[in-house]
Amino acid sequence: MGKIIGIDLGTTFSAIAELDDLGNPEVLSDPENNNRITRSAVYIGRDKAIVGDKALDAAVTNRKNTILEVKSQMENDVVWSTKEGKWIDKEGKKDIKGYVPSQISSIILSKLKDYSSGVKKAVVTVPAMFAQAARDATMDAAKLAKLDVELINEPTAAVLHYANLPGSSINGRVLIFDLGGGTFDITIAAVNGKKVDVITSVGDKNLGGRRFDEEIINIIDKKYKKAKGKGLENPLEDESLFVIAERIKKILSNKDKVSEIIEGPKGPHKIDVSRTEFENSIDTYVEKIKMLLEQALEESKCKPSNISQTLLVGGSTRMPIVTEIIKKIMKKAPVKGVNVDEAVACGAAIYAGLQNKEGLNSAQKKAISKVELNDVCNFYMGTLIYAVDQERNQGGMINDIVIPRNTKLPCSITKDYRVM
């Protein structure tokens, strides 16, 4: 049948994993630089496309040919114009030259696929809150990369990895807190050994590390303007500032303050950014995270005391404020010790094994023999109908829900409608 791999197709970083000969998920490194995670940046050159850190480097000098965060555009009907260096809405426009999101995403998938050999199938992860249009575009990207693909939600993949760790103590109802570079998901699941039953998922498809970087850039811009009398030029379009902001954010996870020399229109200037300043700047996002935590608990009919463990996923969970939020609401610290950048890819590899049992050796089959996953529908699914209010003798179009959110999958629900 051929090998099946697991791919975490992230907003800012991506990763690929496969089962080793003993059935344990193994993250594959980029053969060019040995990196276990690959930056989801694409540079469109005259002769070929470049993916990864080299593409990000190119963004500093050639932004128009460098595409970042393509994942955030997957559900949109847009084209990246290398002439204008931005996404352009296709609606009402003809003959726009450029690249649609699925084409750019396929370049990343092709790069990752080459880390292994003989790969024709893959399990690709998507945010739990990804719209159907975005899921369809991801499938299109896989086809362009010559991959037969099945999708799995990112937090669901992550809990599979946690539950299948050697000697895992993960059990009972758990909360998966997945804060990455561009999206945020919370999933509550029941874990019994290697059996995972998803209960509910909530999230925000536009909340993640890139938004935090923007706030750091705003801090830098204000301080530069105060010191020099003139602000930076289009700071949120300057990729070199995002590189600096990302570095500041990472350092502030371990230190209270960091200094950087910022080049601007009035010359260089040393700027200090404190952890307190940074955390205050993202207060709106912090409140949204708290709200979604409360929503997940309410939807699952759980109190914090009913949750045995909170599991971290995604690079942005390294920020100290994340631990503070979880401690305050969940009344206990989150579980640490797993590589939060790789957990989703590893879970995808485990799920890939479930989809390819015929292609596994005896040790691999034994390793995943007790793995079981039961997921839910993350969205209300229905159809647009014309309904009549008999009391008011009025009619109108409404969205009639056929499958409620959090319905266990697979499911089959039948409703009868009359055609007018």
Over which residues does each language-model region extend?
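Oxyanion-binding/catalytic loops of NTP- or PPi-dependent enzymes
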Residues: 1-73, 82, 93-94, 98, ...
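Globin-like tetrapyrrole-binding proteins
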Residues: 108
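Structured alpha-helical segments in the cores of large, soluble enzyme domains
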Residues: 112-113
